[in-house]
Amino acid sequence: MSECTHDCSSCGENCSSRTQPQDLREKPHPLSKIKKIIAVVSGKGGVGKSMVTSMLSAQSNRKGFSTAILDADITGPSIPQVFGLSGQAYGDENGILPMKTEKGISVISLNLLIDNVTDPVIWRGPIIAGVVKQFWTDVIWGDVDYMFIDMPPGTGDVPLTVFQSIPVDGIIVVTSPQ
């Protein structure tokens, strides 16, 4: 038996020093209970992710499920516009409350937190990824049957952060015939 290097991922030994990989998943807000999480992704912009996210959420809501949308497209949020939401979400020391659509779908988006929705959001990847994590950990979602996450286009920091830190149950890939 050789000396332990504590690099368990490349070691074939089954010893008592073996450590489990670190779990990077974040816990949702303590007042949130989310049953299923579906991410809506694409390789490029303009293919209809936000529309697919909105329609899936609306259809699930019509079938009697409690639904929510986490708008992770921080630099191009469009979910509030799809549902006609305006104004700002309310928050206090307990957390942030998502806004509700006319039919009761819970929505959180950067557009519901900033003063002027026409101002561009020019943030670097780690800041944007941190905001998405905060949407998961700081928003009081309540009891939700299906949460749909509207992702930004591509495979950058935000999708990687979401897939590492949020326990996604399924992924829907939106494409266009080009």
Locations of the language-model features?
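Phosphate-binding loop that captures ATP/GTP phosphates
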Residues: 66-67, 72-118, 129
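Short glycine/serine/threonine-rich phosphate/pyrophosphate-binding segments
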Residues: 49-54, 77-80, 151-159
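Residue-level signature of catalytic and energy-coupling elements of molecular machines
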Residues: 34, 45, 71, 79, ...
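Conserved catalytic-core segment of NTP-binding enzymes
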Residues: 145-146, 152-178
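Walker A/P-loop phosphate-binding motif and the immediately C-terminal alpha-helix
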Residues: 37-74
